[in-house]
């Protein structure tokens, strides 16, 4: 079975493919010939995920899923949140976002943070949502080379390393995206879709 993942992000696609394993084939927007950038204009993770999935469903007539992820930092009143991917500006890099967070967190003792992923699934005319969350903290400096996004500065609770230093196998076992994806896979198995 093919699962259509409404994303152009190759890092996310690779991560999801590793989480899913051989249960099914995950195809992204590039794989289905969609080159358009899908706007994310909602003020919620759920809204952005649904917006992306709905776009693909409307334009291509395909059942699909999409996700949106936010890093919420207590000391920054929940920022960057829904704007995590473009926190340092519309066309910023992962490093630009990291630099902005580290700059804003300079001298702050409360470093509590959480990653949340919401997956929206459009299947057979119905909408379903799956959420994953992991609590942790923002480190004072970058550590590790694996992963992407804020992984070099996010240390999950119960671990002494950042996501980027844990290695992809461990991250893909415990991450917010893995938690949400496991919920989606469980749903698909229960519905006998997988």
Which residue stretches match the model-derived regions?
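Anionic-ligand binding patches
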Residues: 2-4, 11-194
